[in-house]
């Protein structure tokens, strides 16, 4: 569960390292974002000489959360960190690589490009 003011790691090579969530999209009164939800975030930490700079406002998709998500089969999937992938206006990732595992629920949310770039899909 990601809420406003939550910090997330960046799971791609776009140049940002840490994000802070400032708004959850796709709902007017939603307080928490889960895996597959789109958020608006501000870059708190970035690598120098990259395309994304510190204090830039970006859109991102949550790909991992420490709070477990329950599947239809009864299995609960839980990750070690909160992580997101930065996307552009079309919904495609701005980076060319995705680091770490991602959940299968991203495919249902039509983020197939992120799923195809990920090394492991759980």
From Swiss-Prot:
PROSITE patterns: RIBOSOMAL_L14
Entry GO CC: chloroplast; cytosolic large ribosomal subunit
InterPro entries, per database record: Ribosomal_uL14, Ribosomal_uL14_bac-type, Ribosomal_uL14_CS, Ribosomal_uL14_sf
Subcellular location: Plastid, Chloroplast
One BP annotation, GO: translation
One of the record's GO molecular function terms: structural constituent of ribosome
Gene3D superfamilies: Ribosomal protein L14
Domain of life: Eukaryota
RNA-binding recorded as keyword: yes
SMART domains to which the protein is assigned, alphabetical: Ribosomal_L14 (SM01374)
Alphabetical UniProt keywords: Chloroplast, Plastid, Ribonucleoprotein, Ribosomal protein, RNA-binding, rRNA-binding
CDD domains with a match to the protein in the record: Ribosomal_uL14 (cd00337)
Keyword Nucleus: no
Ranges in a coiled coil: none
SUPFAM superfamilies registered for this protein in UniProt: Ribosomal protein L14
Chain's role: Binds to 23S rRNA.
Quaternary data: Part of the 50S ribosomal subunit.
Similarity remark: Belongs to the universal ribosomal protein uL14 family.
PANTHER family, alphabetized: 50S/60S RIBOSOMAL PROTEIN L14/L23 (PTHR11761), LARGE RIBOSOMAL SUBUNIT PROTEIN UL14M (PTHR11761:SF3)
Protein name: Large ribosomal subunit protein uL14c
Species per Swiss-Prot/TrEMBL record: Chara vulgaris
Taxonomic path: Eukaryota, Viridiplantae, Streptophyta, Charophyceae, Charales
Gene, per the UniProt record: rpl14
């Amino acid at each position: 569960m990601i809420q406003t003011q939550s910090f997330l790691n960046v799971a791609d090579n776009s140049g940002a390292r840490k994000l802070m969530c400032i708004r959850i999209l796709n709902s007017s009164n939603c307080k928490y974002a889960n895996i597959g939800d789109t958020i608006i975030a501000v870059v708190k930490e970035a690598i120098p000489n990259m395309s994304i700079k510190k204090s830039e406002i970006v859109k991102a998709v949550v790909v991992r959360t420490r709070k477990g998500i329950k599947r239809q089969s009864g299995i609960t999937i839980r990750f070690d960190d909160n992580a997101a992938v930065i996307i552009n206006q079309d919904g495609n990732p701005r980076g060319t690589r995705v680091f770490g595992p991602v959940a299968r629920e991203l495919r249902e949310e039509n983020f197939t490009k992120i799923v195809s770039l990920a090394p492991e899909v759980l």
